[in-house]
Regions:
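Generic macromolecular interface patches on structured domains
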Residues: 92, 235, 291-294
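N-terminal, charge-rich interaction modules
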Residues: 16-33, 270, 299-317
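Short helix-loop-beta junction
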Residues: 110-117, 283-291
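N-terminal export/assembly segments and adjacent metallocofactor-ligating motifs
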Residues: 1-227, 266-267, 431
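Short connector loops at secondary-structure junctions
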Residues: 116-136, 293-320
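Non-catalytic alpha/beta scaffold blocks inside enzyme catalytic domains
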Residues: 130-289, 324-433
Length: 433
């Protein structure tokens, strides 16, 4: 089927195509407004790119062929060897999981057939959310609702621009919004180590407030804010290094807000028991909803992490970190952490899937590896079997689920390279078992 959004440049019909409304697979926001040119197989981002998307789309692929222990083979031979290794394994581990919806479905099917464990490489950050959602629940917004309606944003943590370079441009300070419901000026508050005030500008941004503190102090600051909102006296002069007077000022901002959003990115909250910080953020939202409209917004989800968790949930009934050793899915967020299992020597084969970024390497391990990776993937040691695969949204069409978990977006085939889909390779391995 021809892509209606792709058009050939006049006078250069054979070698030059322009793709409009391209969805970028290189971060969890899945920005879908890019324009990308394909000239003789080389891609160039022409509009609405960021550093992450430009690096991803414009990366030159090195020559890559299927290999068995470093020796070039055909894809059929690599599939046969991978199937033999998986069939012999007592406890195969299916990790990485940087793929699209179809690839994740195929990974779960193969893991079920092989009696393996399934866990995404970035699930440690995700479980900072899952533990709170499972135990207490929450009220969340979406990227679109935040963009269109928020008049107060409280950004918890830092490095959001590193995860999502266009978050502030597209969501916090967009040039326009729907329905003309956005406040004329929105206030942005930063609580964390590196306030990103310089990233927030534009006609819709009014005041920006920075409450700098260490990441391990964010929970204390949020706790003091919740106490003051509920009318409790705080005897200390500071909380988390922030003067109580500044926290009182934030209380007034919260009370004046018509649609407030608390934003956090679990991958940036890298500290022991970070779920307690997430719990304070979502608890703040619950407190404020007693009298007004407030919501949370969790970011992250790069490398297909949100997609993997969503597919796992609707296929098995459980989030990631499940085992099919018994023939049915068994969920244990501690026991089935692949990183922990590799350190403890509990797996005898690692099947690693990394189809998006070349830096998404497996951990160093003595366990034999079957790798489905984008060409140029940086491996800590040679794989028993390596099979180059295409990147969804670049080398083939597909679907990914956005970081706010409310929509799956279609990915176009930009025809960079003729590489197989993860889903097809995994299906071939399963058929060969």
């Amino acid at each position: 089927m021809q892509d209606s959004s792709a058009r050939e440049a006049p006078g250069d019909r054979a070698t030059h195509k322009l793709f409009e409304n391209v969805t970028c697979p290189f971060c969890g926001m899945l920005c879908d407004d890019l324009e990308v040119e394909n000239r003789d197989g080389a891609l160039k981002v022409l509009k609405n790119g960021c550093g992450r998307s430009i690096a991803g789309f414009e990366r030159k692929l090195p020559p890559s062929r299927p290999q068995i222990r470093g020796k070039d083979v055909t894809l059929a031979e690599a599939v046969k060897e991978a199937a033999a290794l998986i069939g012999k394994a007592n406890n195969p581990l299916f990790g990485g999981l940087a793929t699209d919806v179809e690839g994740m479905r195929a990974a779960l099917s193969l893991a079920e057939r092989a009696g393996g464990v399934v866990d995404h490489a970035l699930s440690e950050g995700q479980y900072r959310n899952v533990k709170v959602l499972q135990s207490a629940g929450w009220t969340t917004s979406t990227l679109t609702e935040t963009r269109n309606r928020a008049d107060l944003l409280i950004v918890v943590g830092s490095d959001i621009r590193k995860l999502h370079p266009r978050f502030f441009d597209r969501v916090v300070s967009p040039p326009d919004s729907m329905f003309d419901v956005t406040a004329l000026k929105r206030t942005v508050v930063f609580i964390g180590e590196v306030p990103e005030r310089a990233a927030v500008n534009g006609p819709q941004v009014g005041d920006t407030v920075a409450l700098p503190c260490k990441v391990e102090q964010i929970g204390e600051v949020l706790g003091a804010l919740r106490a003051r909102l509920r009318g409790f006296r705080v005897n200390a002069k500071t909380a988390g290094g922030i003067a109580i007077a500044k926290i009182n000022a934030l209380v007034e901002l919260c009370r004046q807000a018509k649609y407030g959003v608390v934003v956090w990115a679990p991958p940036t909250l890298d500290l022991p028991h970070a779920e307690l910080t997430v719990d304070q953020a979502t608890g703040l939202v619950k407190d404020l909803n007693q009298t007004q409209r407030f919501a949370g917004l969790s970011l992250g989800g790069n490398e297909g992490a949100v997609t993997a968790a969503a597919v796992s949930t609707w296929q098995s009934g459980f989030p990631l970190r499940i085992s099919y050793a018994s023939g049915a899915p068994h969920f244990d967020p501690y026991r089935y952490s692949i990183n922990r299992m590799l350190i403890a020597g509990e797996g005898d084969l690692l099947v690693w899937i990394a189809s998006i970024s070349p830096d998404f390497a497996p951990p160093a391990t003595d366990v034999a590896m079957v790798v489905l990776g984008t060409p140029g993937l940086k491996l800590p040691q040679p794989a028993a079997v390596f099979m180059p695969v295409g990147t969804p949204g670049v080398d083939h069409a597909g679907r990914l689920i956005r970081c706010d978990s409310v929509v799956s977006l279609p990915l176009k085939n930009l025809h960079r390279a003729e590489l197989p889909r993860v889903a097809d390779v995994l299906a071939s391995i399963e058929a060969a078992l």
